Amino acid sequence: NILGLSLFLSTFYLSEVQAESPAYAVQDNTTVYQSKRPDSRLFVSQTVDNEIDRVSKMLKNKKLAWMFSNCLPNTLDTTIHYRTQDGEDDTFVYTGDIHAMWLRDSGAQVWPYLRFAQQDKKLQKMLKGVIRRQIKCILFDPYANAFNDGPTGGYWMSDNTKMKPELHERKWEIDSLCYPIRLAY
């Protein structure tokens, strides 16, 4: 179970950090580990929020509970741009602080939410939108790995390839196709 392994490794890491750093040894998580979720979350899933509450209550280590409650929803809170376009679900996923969507990264970013999709119609629509967007991107340029949200141009426009303003980067690798197939499957 990937969640169990993540929690185990996080606990191990936190115990190592606590041993080396007195700042992390603070028992009161209101000082060092103050949780700050964005006030304007981009996408909210009540199912994911309920799971965060459920798991956090089970964790005896407050720092680990804080880490879990901030990590699990981070993609939803900060990178998901869901909308309908021409009556169809469409989801553009920012990759970190860059306002572009990488095929590999967007698939990996939403992967943890698949387990909640059966219970959450809103989450299903968002995931369907990611798959639709990835397919649309691949059909637009099968050799690109990262796309803009429309014809905005960008830093890599001077690449020695057939760049178009809808492309962020044209550096295709096999995982540029594997991750969309994995997500759609």
What are these regions (language model features)?
Residues 20-104:
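Low-complexity, Ser/Thr/Pro/Gly-enriched N-terminal "stalk/linker" regions
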Residues 99-127, 131-185:
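Aromatic-rich carbohydrate-recognition surfaces in CAZymes
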Residues 3-12:
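Bacterial N-terminal signal peptides
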Residues 1, 87-89, 167:
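Intrinsically disordered, low-complexity segments enriched in polar/charged residues with Gly/Pro
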Residues 15-18:
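Sec/Tat signal peptide C-region and signal peptidase I cleavage site
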